[in-house]
């Protein structure tokens, strides 16, 4: 949803994190709730509102992140329809009990982070707008591109990590000696039934470092 002037080179390359503004905003919501909501939205620390009212504000002095913790709303119905792997401790629940066990928001701490890059902001916007209906993936061959600590929220489904709103490590789904949660059933189906292999036995075929790395991942 960014226009060209918002993502062109030299614009929004870095946006400062200003946690000291959080108390001022909270005070405004306590004393003047209607004025505050008109100015910064229903939840001032939700990613969509931070982008709309701060990062993309026409006022240059507002081009900051005014908190040390941002959040993304979780549409629980959409999440359950998506087929995402639920933490094992709530997998047995049904109906309203299951929905009640799912957090209302994904909270992302910015502690000790002084600024967010354009890449960070783009990732946050994609997560905020996917509504948890359309899966977002990161290839396992790609190194870390963001200082935001998302590793615990990844679930491996094959050669890709899927973004989720669950901190699987806290929920107890990351096994010993593992870095990420694994959706075993979906991974098995992808590797055994959906992936297509072949051609590596072609005489004289040259495998560059990128292709060879992918072969190692398959293995």
Model-derived regions, located:
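ER/secretory pathway lumenal C-terminal domains and tails of membrane proteins involved
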Residues: 2-219
């Amino acid at each position: 949803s960014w226009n060209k002037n918002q993502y062109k080179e030299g614009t929004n390359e870095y946006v400062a994190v200003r946690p000291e503004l959080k108390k001022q905003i909270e005070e405004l919501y306590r004393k003047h709730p209607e004025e505050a909501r008109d100015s910064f939205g229903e939840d001032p620390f939700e990613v969509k509102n931070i982008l709309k009212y701060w990062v993309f504000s026409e006022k240059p002095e507002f081009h900051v992140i005014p908190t040390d913790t941002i959040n993304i709303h979780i549409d629980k119905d959409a999440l359950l329809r998506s087929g995402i792997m639920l933490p094992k401790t709530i997998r047995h629940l049904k109906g309203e009990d299951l929905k009640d066990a799912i957090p209302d928001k994904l909270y992302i701490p910015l502690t000790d982070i002084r600024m967010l890059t354009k890449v960070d902001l783009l990732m946050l916007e994609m997560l905020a707008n996917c509504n948890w209906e359309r899966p977002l993936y990161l290839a396992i061959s790609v190194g870390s591109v963001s200082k935001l600590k998302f590793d615990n929220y990844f679930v491996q489904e094959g050669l890709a990590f899927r973004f989720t709103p669950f901190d699987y490590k806290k929920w107890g789904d990351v096994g010993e000696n593992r870095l990420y949660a694994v959706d075993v059933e979906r991974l098995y189906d992808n590797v055994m039934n959906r992936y297509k292999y072949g051609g590596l036995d072609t005489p004289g075929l040259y495998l560059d470092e990128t292709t060879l790395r992918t072969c190692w991942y398959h293995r």
